[in-house]
Amino acid sequence: MPRRREVAKRVILPDPKFNDRVVAKLVNVIMVGGKKSTAERALYGALEVVSQKTGEEAVKVLKKCLDNIKPTLEVKSRRVGGSTYQVPVEVRADRRVSLAMRWLVKYANDRSEKTVTDKLAGEILDVYNNRGAAVKKREDTHRMAEANRAFAHYRW
């Protein structure tokens, strides 16, 4: 953390196809090894599959999907005396979105479909319908925060 001044947030430009910042950010999360065009191809293909299967606008489905997995609470470790407590804290708005995207991509990659496009499309559709591993991750995070509610007074 810098001591002098607050670091300015980088502005992410909207993607060329959908003209949307959320899609551009998700492309950056999917990207591995600087291969942005490959990540774009995978996401655009997945959004195409999603729009065909749902009959709705792909970006709207994606945003609803991300809303379904945004966590509101998480736990952070806090050392008090000799023991470490898992203290529940609220998640900042920007972190909610980034966690949701990371979880979506992580659990999409863990799926058994053949291509990345199919994996992403499958996970987006599952999360849209409140199923899938990413939804389970959000529920587990909330459950963990609820279980450690007794330590909420250690918040900083």
Swiss-Prot record:
Presence of keyword 4Fe-4S: no
Disulfide bonds: none
GO annotations of cellular component type: small ribosomal subunit
Family matches, as InterPro entries: Ribosomal_uS7, Ribosomal_uS7_bac/org-type, Ribosomal_uS7_dom, Ribosomal_uS7_dom_sf
GO BP annotations, alphabetical order: translation
GO molecular function, one term: structural constituent of ribosome
Keywords from the named record: Ribonucleoprotein, Ribosomal protein, RNA-binding, rRNA-binding, tRNA-binding
Matching Pfam families: Ribosomal_S7
Keyword Transmembrane: no
Assembly with partners or alone: Part of the 30S ribosomal subunit. Contacts proteins S9 and S11.
Family in the record: Belongs to the universal ribosomal protein uS7 family.
Role: One of the primary rRNA binding proteins, it binds directly to 16S rRNA where it nucleates assembly of the head domain of the 30S subunit. Is located at the subunit interface close to the decoding center, probably blocks exit of the E-site tRNA.
NCBIfam families found in the cross-reference section: rpsG_bact
The protein, known as: Small ribosomal subunit protein uS7
Lineage of the organism: Bacteria, Pseudomonadati, Thermodesulfobacteriota, Desulfuromonadia, Geobacterales
Gene (name only): rpsG
